[in-house]
């Protein structure tokens, strides 16, 4: 009896025999065929079929043989079937003589009498402006109406379930300009999905309707969003940013108004560095710069795992802050497919940065990971700067792409979603695709009211999103960029501009800061009525770092600063010393336990919980644990003998990490509590009582750990790198050796 697979093969063979009159044998000509459109494909296929002889009975042996072969193939291994399939050419069916036309729905989904001004005044519609072109032979209004129908309540036929309410939420075409391919559609606010947990709006619903199925319609050549307007009542349902560059300025000690350029970089190479070299690169840049970000593909690669590289970054930051006296910032990539993974990454990073947590931003690849990832970060970590990276956006936003939406629309949506900052390219002043008019993107992100290509958007106090400029920028390109934009209140991430500088990343970072200063001095008239380029050259004569940028990026210098060699007296040599840094010095530097704003008091700066005003009680918040770090800090608590925890054990084992005790004798001790889930001292004292029995009896809580029950998970236990007790016992085993 034949096997089931062989029987299946015979059936396939019979199918091939029956279909012998319907298809032609593949030829080399069809193998290389590339069809740009379906209609063209069908026409080519039809012309090729006319070249073939009509099937006859002589084809039957061939068909039967093919059927037998198919039977054997089906009865063989999967690998054999794959090999046969790969060897076959695609055969196209004969073109159908029937030309399908879309249902003309303009009587329902179009109302050209509607006034845009009135639609905006009513505030009940999201307005979207498209560049849309129907395919040849299709009426513009009918296609636009079909476009609106497919984007809202309709389909390609009338359905019996439609009622009056359904029609009341139809999307409506209210303006067309066929000659310029312009089409505007009004979407009722009620169409868009809302959260069931809090009633808030969701961007995925906006995109599903406005840029969803309409991108694949058979009667549309292309359609692309060029502007979108959100009415105030609907805009308020989105999160918007929770922090932005103002918070960075505050951390950097620059106030909250016109704090200027945040000089940043991307660690280069973008991939391939292991943890320690990565930390070294951070330390080197922070000698002159403010801000470092993970590049968008950096995360948790096997050769550079987060639990190894983040501690190196923290060490580098502490050392750089101590040596420069200036705060530093880092943006850690927490992008992942799984929201739980994103949250886990974020919590881990915050635990490692501890009291420097406010100096840490979270980077999310917002385009490739989607709006869900942006919202996960925004809602779970509202106190962190949400760094929106747009890698991949060019596939839909590029001017060369006629579908999707523009870069302007993309960045506008990021503000609505809650991005603290988003990359905006370089407005044609760097290597990325763009135009000088892209400054309107920055205006839409930062102003409370701004004009887009088609709509005037009022933000009603929604926090601004900070433009992040990157892509081929260096000190020489910055002055003209600032002049085009009109200000320098942006974040710069110059990878090559810093690490490509001939004298190293410290000088590269400093040169970028000098590029901003040179522009400001020229703007203030310090150099008289000379051109901007001549003003920058005058500045460079007395500033070696930006002069080094001229010597490094000579092609840029030739293009932007004609005659710079003669004006700077360039001889081919540079007086700038090569940058260097000592990793051992960095590793041995005293840990900087403070945050970045020295004006803050220890009591405010080091709190790790919250006060219940009603009961005047301080509650410890595990989410703000700071002592799970490389050393103890005195704000956590004191041992029973009064020894601050930043010196306990470290006095014997790690003297290089001991910093000054900021607590003033006689003043109120920092009110934080050890919780018993952390561990026990060797004498059995639970850590929620250690020291507090003497210094903070009012904060002592019950010991929640039951004898014999499992200890808390490792991440909430002591880790070896936290520190040592005075007798040398590592904190991972302190107390547990005796008690557990």
From Swiss-Prot:
Key word Metal-binding present: yes
Q: Which UniProt keywords are present, listed alphabetically?
A: Calvin cycle, Carbon dioxide fixation, Chloroplast, Lyase, Magnesium, Membrane, Metal-binding, Monooxygenase, Oxidoreductase, Photorespiration, Photosynthesis, Plastid, Transit peptide, Transmembrane, Transmembrane helix
- UniProt modified residues of type N6-carboxylysine: 293
Signal peptide: which range, if any? none
Transit peptide: first to last position: 1-55
Q: Which gene encodes it?
A: rbcL
Protein name per the record: Ribulose bisphosphate carboxylase, chloroplastic
Record Pfam families: RuBisCO_large (PF00016), RuBisCO_large_N (PF02788)
Site keyed Transition state stabilizer: positions: 431
């Amino acid at each position: 009896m034949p096997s089931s697979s062989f029987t299946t093969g015979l059936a396939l063979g019979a199918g091939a025999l029956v279909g012998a009159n319907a298809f032609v044998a593949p030829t080399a000509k069809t193998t290389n065929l590339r069809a740009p459109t379906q209609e063209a494909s069908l026409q080519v296929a039809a012309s090729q079929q006319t070249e073939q002889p009509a099937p006859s009975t002589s084809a039957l042996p061939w068909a039967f043989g093919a059927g037998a072969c198919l039977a054997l193939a089906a009865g063989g291994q999967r690998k054999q079937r794959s090999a046969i399939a790969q060897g076959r050419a695609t055969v196209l069916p004969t073109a159908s003589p029937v030309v399908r036309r879309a249902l003309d729905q303009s009587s329902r989904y179009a109302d050209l009498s509607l006034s845009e001004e009135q639609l905006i005044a009513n505030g009940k519609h999201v307005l979207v402006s498209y560049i849309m072109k129907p395919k040849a032979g299709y009426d513009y209004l009918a296609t636009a109406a079909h476009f609106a129908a497919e984007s809202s309540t309709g389909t390609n036929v009338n359905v019996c379930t439609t009622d009056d309410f359904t029609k009341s939420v139809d999307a409506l075409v209210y303006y067309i300009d066929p000659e310029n391919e312009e089409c505007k559609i009004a979407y009722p606010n009620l169409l868009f999905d809302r959260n069931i947990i809090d009633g808030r709006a969701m961007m995925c619903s906006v995109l599903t309707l406005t840029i969803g199925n309409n991108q694949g319609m058979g009667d549309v050549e292309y359609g692309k969003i060029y502007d979108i307007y959100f009415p105030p009542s609907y805009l308020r349902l989105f999160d918007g940013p929770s922090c932005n560059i103002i918070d960075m300025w505050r951390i950097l000690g620059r106030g909250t108004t016109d704090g200027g350029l945040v000089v940043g970089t991307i660690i280069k190479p973008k991939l391939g560095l292991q943890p320690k070299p990565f930390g070294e690169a951070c330390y080197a840049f922070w000698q002159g710069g403010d801000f470092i970000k993970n590049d968008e593909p950096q995360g948790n690669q096997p050769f550079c795992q987060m639990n190894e590289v983040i501690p190196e970054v923290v060490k580098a930051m502490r050392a750089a802050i101590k040596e420069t006296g200036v705060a530093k910032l880092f943006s850690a990539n927490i992008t992942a497919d799984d929201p739980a993974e994103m949250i886990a990454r974020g919590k881990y990073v915050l635990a490692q940065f501890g009291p420097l947590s406010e100096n840490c931003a979270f980077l999310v690849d917002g385009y490739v990971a989607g709006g869900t990832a942006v919202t996960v970060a925004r809602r779970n970590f509202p106190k962190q700067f949400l760094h929106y990276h747009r890698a991949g956006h060019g596939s839909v936003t590029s001017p060369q792409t006629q579908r999707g939406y523009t870069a302007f629309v993309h960045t506008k949506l990021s503000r609505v979603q809650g991005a603290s900052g988003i990359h905006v390219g370089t407005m044609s002043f760097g290597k990325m695709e763009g135009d000088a008019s892209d400054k309107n993107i920055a205006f839409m992100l930062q102003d409370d009211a701004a004009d887009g290509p088609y709509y005037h958007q009022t933000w009603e106090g929604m926090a601004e999103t900070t433009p992040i400029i990157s892509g081929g920028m260096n000190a020489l390109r910055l002055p003209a960029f600032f002049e085009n934009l009109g200000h320098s209140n942006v974040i710069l991430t110059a990878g090559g501009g810093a690490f490509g500088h001939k004298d190293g990343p410290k000088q590269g970072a400093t040169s970028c800061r000098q590029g901003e200063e040179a522009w400001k001095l020229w703007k203030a008239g310090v150099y008289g009525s000379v051109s901007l380029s001549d003003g920058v050259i005058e500045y460079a004569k007395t500033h070696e770092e930006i002069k080094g940028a001229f010597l490094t990026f000579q092609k840029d210098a030739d293009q932007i600063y004609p005659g710079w060699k003669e004006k700077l007296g360039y001889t081919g040599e540079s007086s700038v010393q090569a940058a260097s840094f000592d990793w051992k010095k960095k590793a041995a530097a005293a840990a900087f336990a403070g945050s970045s704003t020295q004006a803050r008091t220890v009591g405010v700066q080091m709190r790790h919980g919250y006060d219940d005003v009603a009961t005047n009680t301080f509650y410890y918040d595990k989410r703000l644990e700071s002592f799970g770090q490389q050393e103890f800090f005195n704000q956590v608590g004191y041992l029973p003998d009064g020894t601050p925890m930043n010196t306990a054990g470290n006095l014997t084992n790690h003297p290089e990490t001991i910093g000054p005790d900021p607590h003033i004798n006689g003043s109120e001790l920092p009110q934080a509590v050890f919780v018993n889930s952390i561990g026990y001292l060797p004498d059995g004292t639970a850590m929620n009582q250690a020291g507090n029995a003497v210094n903070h009896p009012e904060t002592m809580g019950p010991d929640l750990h039951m004898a014999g029950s499992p200890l808390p998970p490792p991440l909430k236990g002591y880790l070896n790198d936290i520190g040592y007790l005075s007798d040398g016992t590592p904190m991972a085993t302190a107390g547990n050796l005796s008690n557990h």
